C-alpha cells in the first residue's frame, strides 16, 4: 500500500525536476545562436563610438590585426634575464591620426585614421 507521504515525496521530486528542466531549457534558449568559430574580430577600421556620439559623431579604432605565440628558441632563452618559454608578437589596431575634442566636459580623442601597429599596453615605459 502506498502512503500519502510517499506520494507527496514523489510529487515534490517530480516538481523540482520539472522546474530544473524549465530553467535549463530557458537558459539554453536565451543563449545566442551563433557559430563561435565565425566570431573572428573584424578588420582594423574606424567605428562609431555610440557612448560619446551624442551631438556629433565620434570615431574610435576598432578591430583586430594579428597576434601569435610560439616557443622561444633555446638560444634566446639563454640570453634572457627572466627566461620565458613562450614568445608572443602582437599588432593592435591603433589611431594613426586623431585629435582631442570635448564631450560633456570630458576630453576624448576622435580618431581619423587607423592602422596596425605596436600594442601600446605591451610597451615598457
UniProtKB/Swiss-Prot annotation:
InterPro entries found in the cross-reference section: Cystine-knot_cytokine, Glyco_hormone
S-S bridge residues: 41-64, 44-93, 61-114, 65-116, 92-119
Single GO MF annotation: follicle-stimulating hormone activity
Listed GO biological process terms: G protein-coupled receptor signaling pathway; positive regulation of steroid biosynthetic process; regulation of signaling receptor activity; thyroid hormone generation
Major subcellular site: secreted
Domain of life, per lineage: Eukaryota
Signal peptide, first to last residue: 1-30
Keyword list, A-Z: Disulfide bond, Glycoprotein, Hormone, Secreted, Signal
Keyword Glycoprotein: yes
Organism: Fundulus heteroclitus (Killifish)
Function: Shared alpha chain of heterodimeric glycoprotein hormones. These hormones bind specific receptors on target cells that in turn activate downstream signaling pathways. Involved in gametogenesis and steroidogenesis.
Family indicated by similarity: Belongs to the glycoprotein hormones subunit alpha family.
Oligomeric and partner information: Heterodimer. Glycoprotein hormones are heterodimers composed of a common alpha chain described here and a unique beta chain which confers their biological specificity to the different hormones.
SUPFAM superfamilies in alphabetical order: Cystine-knot cytokines
Glycosylation sites: 85, 110
UniProt protein name: Glycoprotein hormones alpha chain
Localisation per UniProt entry: Secreted
A Gene Ontology term for the protein's cellular component: follicle-stimulating hormone complex
Amino acid at each position: 500500500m502506498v502512503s500519502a507521504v510517499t506520494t507527496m515525496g514523489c510529487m515534490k521530486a517530480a516538481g523540482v525536476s520539472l522546474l530544473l528542466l524549465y530553467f535549463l531549457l530557458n537558459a539554453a534558449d536565451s543563449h545566442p545562436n551563433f557559430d563561435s568559430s565565425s566570431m573572428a574580430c573584424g578588420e582594423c577600421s574606424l567605428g562609431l563610438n555610440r557612448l560619446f556620439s551624442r551631438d556629433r559623431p565620434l570615431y574610435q579604432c576598432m578591430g583586430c590585426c594579428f597576434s601569435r605565440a610560439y616557443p622561444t628558441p633555446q638560444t634566446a632563452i639563454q640570453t634572457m634575464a627572466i627566461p620565458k618559454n613562450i614568445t608572443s608578437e602582437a599588432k593592435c589596431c591603433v589611431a594613426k591620426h586623431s585629435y582631442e575634442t570635448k564631450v560633456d566636459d570630458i576630453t576624448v580623442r576622435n580618431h581619423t585614421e587607423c592602422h596596425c601597429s605596436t600594442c601600446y599596453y605591451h610597451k615598457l615605459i
